[in-house]
A protein has these predicted regions:
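Jelly-roll (double-stranded beta-helix
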Residues: 1-262
């Protein structure tokens, strides 16, 4: 298994609302300078943080499946479908943007979370009816495995169903404790360390990973990934499993096809 570590300097960054909303982007948009441009169906990943209350005005999306997951604070969502909802820490908002939707966001002070885009097959997604849903922390299943706390965001028993092939977990490891995950052949796990330090191991390949670092583990054959928190600190890691390669034509290819027919 190939395990690749990306420092903050190898990730993209951004800001909004006159610098109030800052973003660390493990996977930025094309041209933003992140070392990783996509991992299979995982198209974009930004970790946003606010210093004070802030907002983003109404803006459009089409086709992509976009989720916002909060670590701390609050986010209020408003869209052209008529939705106006708020979530708190541990909550999630998901848009399947289909034929197109516009939305605006308001952020509370000291809010931290992720916006993550998954790419379904746009030959179908561009013509689907857009949808919105939101969930609170208690809506998600939690498993305790060898003292590791595993909250399933996408996957078995999660209330969320998306079209793109993806699973997602919020993993908390007490100091010195470990977690093991089987990665199927042809799949990758992308991980972002939001707290603590940990050791990532597959076979003889071992890496030390610190807070803010981004990890991509690509399984050419079915293999185990072992993650252990350092003895001195707890760790919190967001993990996303997706196909290593997008299994259908990309959104760019679909756009070219659509434009050629118009």
């Amino acid at each position: 298994m190939a395990i690749r570590i990306y420092s903050v300097d190898q990730q993209a960054s951004g800001q909004f609302d006159e610098g109030n909303i800052t973003e660390q982007k493990p996977i930025g948009f094309p041209g933003e300078g992140s070392a990783v441009e996509r991992v299979g169906t995982l198209f974009y990943w930004a970790w946003f943080q606010t210093k004070r209350e802030g907002s983003l005005p109404l803006h459009p999306h089409r086709g992509f499946e976009i989720l916002s997951y909060l670590l701390e604070g609050t986010v209020q969502h408003q869209d052209t479908l008529g939705n106006e909802q708020s979530i708190g820490a541990g909550g999630l908002q998901i848009m399947q943007t289909g034929t197109g939707v516009q939305h605006a966001e308001k952020y509370g002070k000291d809010t931290s979370g992720f916006q993550i885009w998954f790419e379904p097959f746009m030959g179908e997604a561009y013509y689907a009816t857009p949808t919105y849903a939101d969930y609170e922390d208690e809506d998600f299943p939690v498993e305790i495995r060898n003292q590791a706390k595993i909250k399933t965001i996408l996957g078995t028993d999660s209330p969320i169903r998306i079209v793109a092939d993806a699973q997602m977990w919020d993993l908390t490891l007490p100091a010195g404790q470990s977690f093991e995950q089987v990665i199927p052949e042809g799949y990758s796990i992308a991980g972002l360390v939001v707290e603590g330090e940990s050791t990532w191991k597959s076979g003889i390949d071992t890496h030390q990973v610190s807070v803010n670092e981004f990890v991509v583990c690509e399984a050419e054959q079915t293999q185990n990934l072992h993650i252990q928190s350092k003895e001195q600190t707890d760790s919190r890691i967001i993990l996303i499993q997706v196909p290593s390669v997008l299994p259908y034509p990309s959104y760019k290819e679909i756009k070219i096809r659509i434009q050629s027919k118009s």
